[in-house]
Structures are given as C-alpha cells and as structure tokens.
Design a protein with these regions (language model features):
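Catalytic, metal-anchored helix/loop core of enzyme active sites in primary metabolism
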Residues: 148-150, 158-161, 165, 183-190, ...
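Substrate-binding/catalytic subdomain of NAD(P)-dependent oxidoreductase enzymes
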Residues: 173-273, 278-280
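Conserved active-site and cofactor/substrate-binding residues in soluble primary-metabolism enzymes
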Residues: 7, 11, 15, 35, ...
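A conserved regulatory-domain signal marking ACT and ACT-like small-molecule sensing domains
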Residues: 311-409
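Rossmann-like NAD(P)H-binding beta-loop-alpha module
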Residues: 68, 115-197
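N-terminal glycine-/serine-/threonine-rich beta1-alpha1-beta2 phosphate-ribose binding loop
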Residues: 1-91
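Rossmann-fold NAD(P)-binding glycine/threonine-rich loop
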Residues: 81-87, 91, 98-138
Length: 409
C-alpha cells in the first residue's frame, strides 16, 4: 500500500481526500497498489472532523515517516508551500501540486531538485484544473516543436465576459455575480480580473514549450477592468467576441514573446465560442498542426482528480517522468517580453472626434461614435505603433481608454 500526505486542506486538498476514497478501487488498479492518505498538514483546528486522527500541524511528522512516498501540496502561494515542497523533494519524496504561482515562479528549480533526489515534481492541475494540458504537451506532443499557444485559461473572467455579452452587463455587475457564485475572490479579485492567474499559467506553458524558465514578471499582463458594454457591442458589430487571451509565440528567428490581454477574437476562431467558466488552449505544433484542449478550468473534484492522476504517475514512474517533463533554469531578463508582430487594433478613444482618427491612427474605419467616445479599428499596427498613436491622441487632448489586438483565424 502506498501512503501519501496532503499539505493544505482547503477546496482542492479536501477534494484529493474525497477522490482517493471514492475511486479507491480504480486508483489502486492504475497505481498497481492501494493509495491511502496517512497525514493531512493544516494549521487550522480540525478536531471535530471525522478524519481528525489524520491531521498534523508539523511537516516534520510527514518527513519523519518513511512510509510516505508522495506528498500532495495544495496550500497555495509560495510563503509556506515553496520551502515545504523543497524539503519534501530533498528527502526523496515526490510532490504533486496544483499551485500555479509556485510552479511559475520556481518551476525550473524544483524540477532540477526532483531529478537530483530521484523524485517526481508534477503539476498537471496548475494550468488546466481538471483539463489535461501538461501531460499531453510533454508526452503526446513530444515529437512536436510548439511555436504558438493561444488560450482562455481563466474561467472567472471568461464567465464575466460571457455575462457582459449576453445580458448587456457592466464589469462591476458581472464581477459581483462571479463573487456571489464563488468564481471570484470577494476581498481581492485581482488575480483573476487583472490577469495574474492567466499570466502564471501561460508562463508554465511557455516554459515547457521553449525548454527554459519563462518568468511571469517578464510577461506583459492586462486584465478586463477597462472593458465596457460599448466594447462588447462593438465586438459583436465586428463579428468578434472579447476574450482574455494568454498567449505565447516563438518566431522563426527564435525570438520569444508572450502576454496576457483582452483581445477581439474573430468569430471564425475557435476561441470566440468558448463561454462561461470553460477554458480552451489552442497550440500549434510543427508536425501536428493545431490542437485544442477544452474543459472546465477549475472546480474542487475536477482539479483534485488531476492531482490524484499525478500521484499515480509519481508512484508508477517516479523520476523517469522528467525525461520529458523538464525545463532548464534561465537568467531573468530585464524588462518585458516584446511583441513585434502586426495586428489589427481596436481603439476606444475619448476627447478626439472620430473624423480625426484616420489621420492620427492610420488606415482603418470608425466602429462607433457616441457621447464623446469613438471606437476605431486600425487595419494593421505593432504595439510600438499603437504607443505612438496614444501619444498623438494625448497631444490632441484626448485619451486612449482601451487598445486591443484583433485575433484572426
């Protein structure tokens, strides 16, 4: 029998215990032996729980027990999770986690540490929740060079944008509903609505795609706070939908770029039809072409099931999994990764008449003009071009309230 420990007994951690018990027979069959949770590490008081005997407040209880082969980390954040995971790996125990912040920040270091101590460090649930993405990337797509990733990887903002579109609802109202349903944090929803959650996820995917660590701090990141009902309606007029897109590109010259930002997505693009809390990631491989991963990106049991699947892999494969699941450490570059590609751009401008926009922004057409605001679709421009346009509009006494790339097929 394989004995495991869970660190952190919140939503996902409690889900791991539930999955291990509800599907014990099938897990044992796939792992080659029964899997039992022996310890749960949590500083809170669970003395009234039916599982009170499993709880400990000290990681040393886990590390001093030679029966524990795999540790599940669902604490979240990095303050406690990172040093605890390091200690587990250094002791030769495999670690399975759903912690995207830790993987995005310390992934290369922890992967190397796992290899050094003949352990596994697995994190399928960190990007897609219950939707498999990491394992298909390093196994099924191993013969491909991944040059492009486009994804909707945050279910909360996708739910909000869907609400705004279907019900002509503003950002604040959509956020309130997302909070009431438990999709967004009540105290600070910034990780979701400001794009930080999506940034961490695309940093992990980019690291796996290019083979070296991509730091979240180097990825330009914007959220959806500036999106208005007028923008949603303008998108419909342009046969498009507004989505928060996390993306990665590798050019023919090997130059890499990545970002998280709201985009106009043409209705002919598969991502435009991904609504509510669903996520989708579109990847381009040099041999396979396009492949799409689609499913719910969060939820207690879907995410926990992905963590338990990693536990099975850790028990069966151990350090061998890192023959393909690995990326190298890299020096952290200065500044942000720069996107030099050309796109159509949607601009919503205040304080400047629509008639002036062609001469200021270049070739394109007016989408709407109303109550001192105008929207203009630029035919083709780079990010640097749009920065220059923004300066020109400010000289004229106006302001670019929103600038979005248009993602075609």
């Amino acid at each position: 029998m394989a004995k495991i420990a869970i660190m952190g007994f919140g939503t996902v951690g409690s889900g791991v215990l539930e999955v291990c018990r509800r599907n014990a027979a099938s897990i044992a069959r796939r792992a080659g032996e029964p899997v039992e949770v022996k310890y749960i590490l949590d500083v809170r008081d669970f003395s009234g729980s039916p599982d009170a005997a499993l709880f400990t407040k000290s990681i040393d209880t886990i590390l001093n027990d030679p029966e524990i082969k795999v540790v599940v980390e669902t604490i979240g954040g990095t303050k406690f999770a990172y040093p605890y995971v390091r200690r587990c790996l250094e002791s030769g125990r495999s670690v399975c986690t759903s912690n995207k912040e830790m993987v995005a920040t310390y992934g290369a270091e922890l992967l190397a540490l796992a290899k050094e101590h003949s352990a596994a460090f697995l994190f399928e649930a960190s990007v897609g929740g219950g939707t498999p993405i990491i394992t298909p990337m390093h196994q099924c797509l191993a013969a491909n060079h991944i040059s492009s990733i486009r994804g909707i990887v945050n279910g909360t903002t996708n739910f909000m944008l869907t609400k705004m579109k279907r019900e002509n609802m503003g950002f604040d109202a959509a956020l309130k509903i997302a909070q009431q349903l438990g999709y967004a944090e009540t105290k600070d929803p910034g990780d979701d609505v400001d794009g930080r959650d999506a940034c961490r996820k695309v940093a992990i995917l980019a690291s796996l795609a290019c083979g070296h660590h991509v730091y979240p701090d180097n990825i330009p990141t914007r959220g959806i706070r500036d999106i208005t009902v007028a923008d949603i309606k303008a998108a419909e007029k342009l046969d498009s939908a507004i989505k928060l897109i996390a993306w990665y590109n590798e050019g023919g010259d090997g130059q890499m770029a990545a970002g998280v930002e709201p985009m106009l997505v043409s209705n002919s693009n598969q991502l435009a039809g991904v609504d509510d809390v669903f996520n989708a990631v579109l990847m381009k491989g040099d041999m396979l072409g396009d492949v799409v991963f689609y499913g719910k990106g969060a939820g207690k049991l879907p995410t926990a099931s992905a963590v338990v699947a990693d536990v099975i892999d850790a028990l069966k494969e151990g350090v061998k999994v890192h023959d393909s699941l690995f990326w190298k450490p890299a020096e952290k570059p200065e500044g942000l990764l720069e996107d030099r590609n050309t796109y159509p751009w949607y601009l919503r401008v205040t304080g400047v008449a629509a008639a002036l926009l062609p001469s200021v922004a270049g070739a394109g057409h007016v989408v709407f003009e109303d109550n001192g605001e105008a929207a203009y679709l630029v035919d083709a421009a780079t990010s640097a071009d749009i920065a220059a346009v923004t300066e020109k509009i400010e000289v004229l006494g106006g302001k670019v309230a929103l600038a979005m790339k248009k993602l075609e097929d």
